[in-house]
């Protein structure tokens, strides 16, 4: 099998980015909201739900970038496979959030290209240091995503049943991903790194909700 050159890998990543940012996405599992009926939402409630789901969509864009960036420089084939598998599972979440945004008459964040490639760069730097650090980033990322999901579940309008079902399933999946990464040897990140990640997350959620 021919070893991919740097240019080959760049083209491969550009192709992957184009595929999962193109609507409609095709998840491997149907949306958890498929059999759920919404209550009546006011325009204000619909706008708020759309803002929350836009944040969650962008969070999944960041996860794709981080995991693919880590996988691109992973030290071992096992780590590379683990990360690409995690990215594939997160793709379903991306598709579910994208579908829900369309139902709410909203669009994804205009800043998603920036967040994807910024996350890809962070992932590549972490992955180039060690696989243990790479898994540590996965653990911390999933924990932060779970906090967002928990707050969004509490903030969703009472009648937004479809969004709620999606976020509940995402929370379960993210929890499993964090446990798997810890078992794979994820190292505990320094407090400074965690603080920077939280700050980046705060900026992302604030901007994605509005734009």
From Swiss-Prot:
It comes from the Bacteria. Its EC number is 1.14.99.60. It is an enzyme of class 1 (oxidoreductase). Pathway: Cofactor biosynthesis; ubiquinone biosynthesis. One of its GO terms (cellular component) is plasma membrane. Its main location: membrane. Binds 2 iron ions per subunit. GO terms for molecular function: 3-demethoxyubiquinol 3-hydroxylase activity; metal ion binding. Its cofactor is Fe cation. It is found in: Cell membrane. Fe cation 2 binds at residues 90, 142, 174, 177. Catalyzes the hydroxylation of 2-nonaprenyl-3-methyl-6-methoxy-1,4-benzoquinol during ubiquinone biosynthesis. Belongs to the COQ7 family. NCBIfam families: DMQ_monoox_COQ7. PANTHER family: 5-DEMETHOXYUBIQUINONE HYDROXYLASE, MITOCHONDRIAL, COENZYME Q10 BIOSYNTHESIS PROTEIN 7. This is 3-demethoxyubiquinol 3-hydroxylase. It comes from Francisella tularensis subsp. novicida (strain U112).
